[in-house]
């Protein structure tokens, strides 16, 4: 049960902390759904790097895959270091705020990458994906602090379910916007 603990050594868990933690996933999941999985990835392959397909079919998809792979490889190497520093200096919230700001800025700047600007788009995708994944690692590190014992799975499930809802809501809004834009062309 949220607000209580099975272990007497810990203070009760505040509802607002659990909600804040879960709603971070709600707000954050639109990035993976829209940028990495569906809309921007297709836009990158078709429009930004699409001109390269004439010379080398499949190259736009390869460049997208390289961008995501480089970001994930960097996170693979940096996550243990970032986590150790965040734990040692007790600055998880500051690192989480920084990763969030970098992800938002990197994502917003993607709008400035037009057809043919492959290097800019790749750099921004790499930056935003690194920041996103770093934020995911940092937000997950808060779970043991807001959940105890038998409620950890339930609280984690709240975050996952709100994340899926947030991702689908963001995707729906984006698809609606794209559809309306195409109607008015």
Where are the regions a protein language model picked out?
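Helix-loop boundary and gating motifs at the non-cytosolic
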Residues: 9-72
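Loop-to-transmembrane helix entry/capping segments in MFS-fold secondary transporters
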Residues: 58-61, 149-159
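Cytoplasmic membrane-interface "Motif A"-like loop-to-helix N-cap segments
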Residues: 86-100
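C-terminal ends and interior cores of transmembrane alpha-helices
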Residues: 100-115
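Hydrophobic core of transmembrane alpha-helices in multi-pass small-molecule transporters
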Residues: 106, 117-135
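Intracellular juxtamembrane helix-capping segments at the cytosolic ends
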Residues: 134-147
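Glycine-rich segments within core transmembrane alpha-helices of 12-TM secondary carriers
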Residues: 157-175
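Conserved small/polar residues in nucleotide/adenosyl-binding loops
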Residues: 183-185
């Amino acid at each position: 049960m949220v607000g209580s603990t099975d272990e007497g050594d810990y203070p009760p868990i505040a509802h607002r902390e659990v909600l804040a933690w879960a709603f971070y996933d709600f707000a954050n999941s639109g990035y993976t759904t829209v940028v990495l999985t569906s809309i921007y990835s297709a836009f990158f392959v078709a429009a930004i790097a699409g001109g390269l397909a004439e010379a080398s079919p499949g190259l736009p998809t390869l460049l997208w895959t390289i961008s995501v792979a480089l970001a994930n490889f960097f996170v693979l190497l940096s996550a243990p270091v970032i986590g150790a520093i965040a734990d040692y200096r007790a600055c998880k919230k500051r690192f989480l705020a920084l990763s969030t700001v970098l992800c938002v800025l990197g994502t917003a700047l993607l709008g400035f990458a037009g057809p043919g600007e492959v290097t800019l788009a790749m750099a921004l995708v790499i930056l935003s994906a690194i920041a996103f994944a770093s934020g995911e690692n940092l937000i997950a590190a808060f779970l043991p602090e807001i959940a105890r014992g038998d409620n950890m799975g339930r609280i984690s499930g709240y975050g996952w379910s709100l994340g899926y809802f947030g991702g689908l809501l963001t995707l729906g809004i984006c698809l609606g916007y794209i559809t309306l834009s195409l109607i008015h062309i």
